């Protein structure tokens, strides 16, 4: 694209764009983590984080990606030989399974096609067949397929039973409605580089009293991820925290609070609706049977090299999207509408997609995708 100045747009489901106001916080002087000044910042930040989890329970921070928080959940809840139910409908459901295997759990797997969403009825059936199961591991937003589950409905099933409900909300938090306490979700994990609009490197976890009951009984080895140490030192950190990431998280939480969490959820819904309208107008098919507000997974049309779509969009037009993972590599592409993204970012991504598909020989009327996305925005913003 030598004729034009190429700007860069991250439209992948993590890392996502980081606002300049948050980047500026990260550039501030690093202060010592054991000073009263920093402990005060840490307390303010972790208390503010309760708002996005919609919980009264403490939120704890690790210097890790979301996978670290996932491992913390398994290590603190599961003892070797414990029976657990794991929903596997994508790459990150597989990660729950692999973590539970690493800690010696007796796994009951609910295996679904990638793109399907587990139902509350399937969870209830698995629990009825396995009343001795101690934990149910779910993925709220399966980033690899663009699928969101009925977490509220599942929580209605589990909260009346002697089982702990865990969800991976790494990509969902801040994009999908999540009301931890009201719904009865027992443990939630997330990461910084998605809906929280931060660089990678920080993970958050919150759990209720029901989950703490298993934490106290767990016989699994744990050290850095031992939640008992974090509870004991709260709001301080038992180990050296990611100081500048905490600055950035504080600013991100302020921005989310100013916008209002319900407005944040609604913004993500609108961007998701526009993206799906655009790809359908192009004659493309969604992978997910229950798509959500985080990312849209699209099947590569017949006769098109799926690996070329993200490559051309990135290298020629400066728009970074994601391809498929694992067995979906080359078969789908994924356009995010997550975190610090606007309607015009979405329109830019759809325009770059159209130009890329046209170059690859896919037949369609140029502009129909952009027009469909604009129609969604017009309806939402000006009532047309």
UniProtKB/Swiss-Prot annotation:
Its EC number is 2.6.1.51. InterPro entries: Aminotrans_V_dom (IPR000192), Aminotrans_V_PyrdxlP_BS (IPR020578), PyrdxlP-dep_Trfase (IPR015424), PyrdxlP-dep_Trfase_major (IPR015421), PyrdxlP-dep_Trfase_small (IPR015422), SP_NH2Trfase/AEP_transaminase (IPR024169). GO terms for biological process: glycine biosynthetic process, by transamination of glyoxylate. Pfam families: Aminotran_5. Its cofactor is pyridoxal 5'-phosphate. The keyword Transferase applies. GO terms for molecular function: alanine-glyoxylate transaminase activity; L-serine-pyruvate transaminase activity. Involved in the degradation of L-serine via 3-hydroxypyruvate. Catalyzes the transamination between L-serine and pyruvate to yield 3-hydroxypyruvate and alanine. Belongs to the class-V pyridoxal-phosphate-dependent aminotransferase family. This is Serine-pyruvate aminotransferase. It comes from Thermotoga maritima (strain ATCC 43589 / DSM 3109 / JCM 10099 / NBRC 100826 / MSB8).
């Amino acid at each position: 694209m030598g004729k034009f100045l190429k700007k860069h747009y991250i439209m992948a489901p993590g890392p996502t764009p980081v606002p300049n106001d948050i980047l500026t916080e990260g550039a501030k002087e690093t202060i010592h983590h054991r000073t009263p000044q920093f402990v005060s910042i840490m307390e303010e930040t972790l208390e503010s984080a309760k708002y996005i989890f919609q919980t009264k329970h403490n939120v704890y921070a690790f210097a890790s990606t979301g996978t670290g928080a996932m491992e913390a959940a398994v290590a603190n809840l599961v003892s070797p030989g414990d029976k657990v139910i794991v929903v596997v409908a994508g790459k990150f459901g597989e990660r729950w399974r692999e973590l539970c295997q690493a800690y010696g759990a007796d796994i009951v797997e609910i295996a679904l096609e990638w793109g399907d969403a587990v139902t509350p009825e399937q969870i209830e059936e698995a629990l009825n067949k396995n009343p001795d199961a101690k934990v149910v591991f779910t993925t709220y937003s399966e980033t690899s397929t663009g699928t969101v589950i009925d977490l509220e409905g599942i929580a209605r099933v589990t909260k009346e039973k002697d089982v702990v409900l865990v969800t991976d909300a790494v990509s969902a938090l801040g994009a999908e409605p999540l009301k931890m306490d009201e719904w009865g979700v027992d443990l939630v994990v997330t990461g910084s580089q998605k809906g929280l609009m931060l660089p990678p490197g920080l993970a958050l976890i919150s759990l209720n009293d029901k989950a703490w009951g298993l934490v106290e009984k767990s016989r699994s080895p744990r050290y850095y991820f031992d939640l008992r140490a974090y509870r004991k030192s709260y709001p301080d950190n038992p180990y050296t925290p990611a100081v500048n990431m905490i600055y950035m998280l504080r600013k991100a939480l302020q921005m989310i609070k100013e916008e209002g969490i319900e407005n944040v959820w609604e913004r993500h819904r609108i961007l998701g609706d526009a993206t799906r309208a655009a790809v359908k107008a192009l004659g493309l098919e969604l992978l997910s049977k229950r798509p959500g507000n985080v990312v849209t997974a699209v099947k590569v049309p017949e006769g098109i090299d799926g690996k070329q779509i993200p490559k051309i969009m990135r290298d020629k037009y400066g728009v970074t999207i994601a391809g498929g993972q694992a067995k979906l590599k080359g078969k789908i592409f994924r356009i995010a509408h997550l975190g610090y993204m606007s309607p015009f970012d979405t329109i830019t991504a759809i325009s770059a997609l159209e130009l890329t598909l046209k170059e690859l020989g896919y037949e369609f009327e140029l502009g129909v995708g952009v027009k469909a996305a604009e129609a969604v925005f017009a309806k939402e913003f000006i009532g047309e």
